[in-house]
């Protein structure tokens, strides 16, 4: 999981990236397999007569929001399905959506697109960060207070517990990336590429020299997953 915040001007681009509605648009992410884009779907309710951006704007205007250009109007959590999860994919994302919608308010959800046209299945859960100001007794839009250090620390274990109870199976939301904090999508993709390269080399060249060379390049938190992936080759990794 990783979290990003967007100003009003930045929100349009991420919302367009999520819905993939324009077939002629060139997306920055080169890993999109457009032949699979039709498999993507949105778990959030439709905003009748409004685009996602228009709904976000309307929701923000319903509450107190600072007019400064640097104020964040939108928050996006990217929830990636764990590689070792073997259960029902649709159910995983449905329950992940339910957890997030209940946490941040169903009325604040802008979109929740599940992307199946990229390397790893994931959901972009986008919402307006509305909080209740106890001192002033009013609701307001404030991403900094909504996604603070306490929230970043608590959400991962709480989501894992919720999903495991609902899905009745182990769900590794708490992984190396979580332990180090919320990483960017680019960082997560780079780590995934390192893992894939290591697995290929170990399978194709299962010699002691290759094993030692490859293992030295693998981040500590990824070794366990790689060991599981190549276990059928009978390799012994340190």
Language model feature labels by segment:
Residues 1-235:
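N-terminal nicking endonuclease/strand-transfer module with a His-rich metal-binding environment
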